[in-house]
């Protein structure tokens, strides 16, 4: 599946940014960092590489660099659907436009498109981990069977990604055998929902706190998570990142 052509689907809604201010900020960051943007035209028949030249907030438009040839430029102008994809800080950014028009920018030919009403942000789940806020701990209940008895072990999350979590086992009750899978683990993601997942132990780190207490930090991978689970996780990651960005910029 090509995300560029499918990002208008409802499945993308958990990852969609609709705030005009956030859309402008994202697109402006892409332009200021000179990130190349892939433009798909004619429903995937043609692709060109462009860049964001300017955001015109007064007219709600985005100015883009032209294609290298007149023929390709005309194909862009003739297209009734334009899809865009780029990467910003390991986050895939997707947006679209119904059409483009030609214009001049700093005495050079350019394209102008309407400011997108929304932008999709997709984390690269295999790389991106978000530390959970200390002010709103994320709980994870892990069913653990030992000697024929199943107990519910309460843990908290140190971090989370689209591929797994890092558990903090303060009482060191869980087995840390690499490859062991815990079924039906329940994670409560504040503001996003409850997920039930299978967690497989991938690594373990024993830590000694300043008070001398020893704890285990267990890195776990999601095993066959559902699309709904991944959507909920991504929704939570996006929420946390927005809150962190708001604090960093003094808006939170």
Swiss-Prot record:
GO terms for molecular function: cyclic-di-GMP binding. Keywords: Bacterial flagellum, c-di-GMP, Nucleotide-binding. GO terms for cellular component: bacterial-type flagellum basal body. Residues 123-238 form the PilZ domain. It is found in: Bacterial flagellum basal body. Pfam families: PilZ, PilZN. It comes from the Bacteria. InterPro entries: PilZ_domain, Split_barrel_FMN-bd, T3SS_YcgR, T3SS_YcgR_PilZN. One of its GO terms (biological process) is bacterial-type flagellum-dependent cell motility. Acts as a flagellar brake, regulating swimming and swarming in a bis-(3'-5') cyclic diguanylic acid (c-di-GMP)-dependent manner. Binds 1 c-di-GMP dimer per subunit. Increasing levels of c-di-GMP lead to decreased motility. Belongs to the YcgR family. Monomer. Interacts with the flagellar basal bodies. HAMAP family: YcgR. This is Flagellar brake protein YcgR. It comes from Janthinobacterium sp. (strain Marseille) (Minibacterium massiliensis).
